[in-house]
Design a protein with these regions (language model features):
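Bacterial N-terminal signal peptides that target proteins for export
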Residues: 2-10
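C-terminal motif of bacterial Sec signal peptides marking the signal peptidase cleavage site
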Residues: 17-20
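A sequence/structural signal for flexible, mid-protein segments enriched
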Residues: 22-73, 77-378
Length: 378
């Protein structure tokens, strides 16, 4: 075995041992139906910081319900200087750092919070690592790319790839996230009912509804869906130190519409501990919706219960540098299998003698929708 192969073998063994050291514990969901989950990054994306979420995941009859916790006192602690900065609680749930907060590359940071019942928690310290830039982004249209959410058919998708150059002579760990934006035509769906502009809801009941189980209503103006990726995508440079990483698969964007769509890719350098946690999470939850959903065994990260050390907390608080790139996916000239963004074939309320119907509905700004054209839209 050559020295190069020996080093590679040793590094692989180190990674395997590191992942296997991540603590997991079985949850009897029939007995314990509520789990404290913490997730989020402190990043150098100061214009669009990560929301740090502290919430309960409740499991009932196989379903998952996420419950934000109000009146939590949360802060970021600089472990070297001891400086503590309070996080700002959001109305929609979660916490953000103050607008003037900046990461010091020489510091390490911990998340500290107290629940309303007085229990105190603190994460192990994390530091920022420099992230190399994204060099190229490109895509391929694949006719039968992925299974539909219900697992009943294959759907077409644009598979998005990127290239970047790994930093040489150091151990690096990467995590990728993406958000994609789709233009949508319909803003409301009413089941066995019609939309009422007076109540802004599906309040006109149709007891003899014998067409389809629903009506879809067009948006009154432009509207864009915001679709965040929920799949974990991590990598170690153990066998590619200093090399150009070409063709890393980042996303499979379903063929929702004949028009193009916009994808924002985030490339992050993360700590070895964060990599081990997310790699373990990747292995356990790729068939589910993410950390808040039910894993085979809950994954304990770096959050410690100071009040009751025996109590386990699921999740991880990390610190990361982000490199971003927005990429336009052009669907011109492709013909594939539609995956309707509504989850069903659109069916609009038919015209009637009442010329005020069917009404159009508003595009209400939220975490999953915006009436404002995203930057980079073509």
């Amino acid at each position: 075995m050559t020295i190069k192969h020996l080093r590679t073998y040793s590094a692989i063994i180190f990674l395997i041992s590191m992942v296997s050291c991540i603590d997991t514990y079985d949850i009897d969901f029939n007995q314990k139906n509520s789990v404290l989950v913490v997730q989020g990054f402190l990043t150098d994306d100061y214009t669009n910081p990560d929301t740090i979420k502290i919430q309960y995941s409740n499991f009932n009859d196989g379903n998952t319900f996420v419950s934000p916790i109000s009146s939590v006192k949360a802060s970021i602690v600089s472990t070297k200087s001891g400086k503590e900065v309070s996080l700002v609680e959001q109305k929609t749930g979660g916490f953000l750092p103050p607008r003037d907060f900046r990461i010091d590359a020489s510091e390490k940071y911990s998340l500290r919070f107290t629940l309303p019942d007085g229990q105190q928690f603190e994460s192990s310290p994390e530091q920022i690592y420099t992230t190399p830039p994204i060099l190229n982004v490109y895509n391929k249209f694949i006719l039968n790319s992925k299974l539909s959410d219900d697992g009943k058919k294959f759907i077409s998708a644009n598979e998005v790839y990127l290239d970047f150059k790994d930093t040489p002579k150091q151990k690096d760990y990467y995590l990728w996230r993406y958000t994609h934006y789709e233009k949508i035509v319909h803003c409301s769906t009413c089941y066995a009912s019609q939309y009422d502009p007076k109540t802004l809801g599906c309040t006109i009941r149709l007891p003899n509804f014998n067409r389809t189980p629903y009506y879809d209503y067009q948006c009154a103006g432009e509207c864009y869906a915001i679709i965040k990726n929920n799949k974990i995508n991590v990598m170690s440079d153990v066998v590619s130190d200093g090399e150009v990483i070409a063709g890393r698969l980042i996303a499979k964007i379903p063929y929702h519409f004949m028009y193009g769509c916009l994808v924002e890719i985030q490339q992050m350098s993360i700590s070895p501990q964060s990599y081990a946690f997310h790699r373990n999470l990747e292995l356990q939850t790729q068939s589910t919706g993410g950390l808040a959903d039910t894993p085979a065994a809950a994954i304990v990260g770096n959050i410690n219960n100071l009040t009751n050390p025996a109590s386990k907390v699921v999740g991880f608080f990390g610190v990361a540098s982000i490199q971003k790139k927005r990429y336009w996916v052009d669907r011109k000239g492709v013909n594939g299998i539609y995956d309707y963004i509504l989850g069903h074939t659109p069916f609009e309320e038919p015209p009637s003698m009442d010329t005020s119907r069917p009404p159009m509905t508003s595009c209400v700004k939220s975490e999953i929708r915006t009436p404002f054209k995203p930057q980079g839209w073509q």
